[in-house]
Amino acid sequence: MGRADVAAALVERIQPTALAREQRLPVLPAFESLIPGGGLRRGSTLATDGPAATSLALAAAAAASQDGAWVAAVGFPSLGLLAAAELGIALERFVLVASPDTEIGPDNEETAWAAAVAALVDAFEVVLVQATHRVKVRDGRRLAARTRERGAVLVQVGSSGWSEGADVTLEVTEARWEGLADGYGHLRSRRVTVVGGGRREASRPRRSELWLPSTDGLVESVVPDPVPLRAG
C-alpha cells in the first residue's frame, strides 16, 4: 500500500467534524493580527517563507492542534517531533509523512506527489507541505480546490516552489538568535520579523516582531500589535 493509500485510509478516522459550526481554526495570540479574521480560515491556503519558514508554519498550526485539529506535515526529512512540540504542536494529533516514493519514474513523480498531498487534505484539517520540486500550476490549482472542498488548511512552506499564490502569506524577513554574550552562553531565543500579506482580505500588508521562541520557550509577540504598512 502506497503512502497516498495509507493517508486515504485515515479519512474516516480523522475527517473534520466541525465544518458547519466553525469556519476558522484558532491561532496563537501572536498570529491573530497577522492573519485576517484572527484564525486560519477553513478552505484556504497559507504560505510561509524566509529563514524560519518551517518554524513559522508549525507555530501557525499549533493552536489548532491544541484545540483538537489533526495536523500532517509532508516533505520535511529533517523535522523532528521534539522541534514540533517545542513550537506548540500537540503530538498526539500530529503525523509526519515522507515525500512519495520515486520508484514510479520521473515522469509521474509530480502527479503522485500531488495525489498524496490531496489524500492528506482529505484526512487532516491542517496540512503542511514542503515541495522539493516546482509545483505545476495545474496541480497547485487542484490542491487549492480540494482544500476548499474539504474545508482544510493547506500550508505551503517555502513558497518559491509553488506557481500559485496563497490566500495568506507570512514571510520572515529577518531572524536572529539571542543569548550568546562575549563568546559564551547558549542560544536561548530567536527574534524574527514577519511580514503578512496575501489576496483579498489579506492584501493589506502587516508586520510584526515575534519570539520564535522566547527565552521561556513560547511563541509570542515582541510588540503586542503589528505595525500596518502602507500599500505601495
Question: Locations of the language-model features?
Answer:
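Long, charge-dense
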Residues: 72-136
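Detector for small/aliphatic-rich hydrophobic stretches
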Residues: 1-73, 199, 229-232
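Short, solvent-exposed amphipathic alpha-helical segments in soluble enzyme
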Residues: 62-63, 88-89, 144-146
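Phosphate-binding/switch region of NTP-binding enzymes
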Residues: 159-224
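Hydrophobic/aromatic beta-strand patches that form the interior of the parallel beta-sheet core
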Residues: 46, 72, 95-97, 155, ...
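A contiguous pocket-lining binding segment that forms or flanks enzyme active sites
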Residues: 120-167
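A short acidic, amphipathic alpha-helical/loop segment
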Residues: 56-60, 83, 116-117, 139-143
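Amphipathic coiled-coil/heptad-repeat helices and related helical stalk/stem segments
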Residues: 27, 31, 57, 110-113, ...
